[in-house]
Amino acid sequence: MFKATARYIRVQPRKARLAAGLMRNLSVMEAQKQLSFSQLKAGRCLKKVLDSAVANAELNENVKREQLNVIEVRVDAGPVYKRTKSKSRGGRSPILKRTSHLTVIVGERER
């Protein structure tokens, strides 16, 4: 199994989990196709992490990309950046800028 992570990505975890659902239990080739046609920002981020995991497999163990499956996709919440927006009469309202930690694990297909 080969793993790649991206941390502190400025994508809301809730939206990133939608993109992660597109690639679960697929072969790497199919997952890359799904993510390349996705219009979600999280889809682009997950595709980069998936490509990194595949590169780890190819460089470290000489495994071909056609033999790999997506075993696990995990989207965890990262820290939240807190900002405020000015409102009328001297008030303000909070703005929460959420971040995500993305983890993709790939491995060889079972025969």
Curated annotation (Swiss-Prot):
Coiled coil: none
Gene Ontology molecular function terms on file: rRNA binding; structural constituent of ribosome
Keywords per UniProt: Ribonucleoprotein, Ribosomal protein, RNA-binding, rRNA-binding
GO cellular component term of the entry, any: cytosolic large ribosomal subunit
Entries under SUPFAM superfamilies matching the protein: Ribosomal protein L22
Recorded superkingdom: Bacteria
Pfam families named in the record: Ribosomal_L22
GO biological process, one term: translation
The family this protein is said to belong to: Belongs to the universal ribosomal protein uL22 family.
Function: This protein binds specifically to 23S rRNA; its binding is stimulated by other ribosomal proteins, e.g. L4, L17, and L20. It is important during the early stages of 50S assembly. It makes multiple contacts with different domains of the 23S rRNA in the assembled 50S subunit and ribosome.
Subunit structure: Part of the 50S ribosomal subunit.
Protein's name according to its UniProt entry: Large ribosomal subunit protein uL22
Originating species: Chlamydia felis (strain Fe/C-56) (Chlamydophila felis)
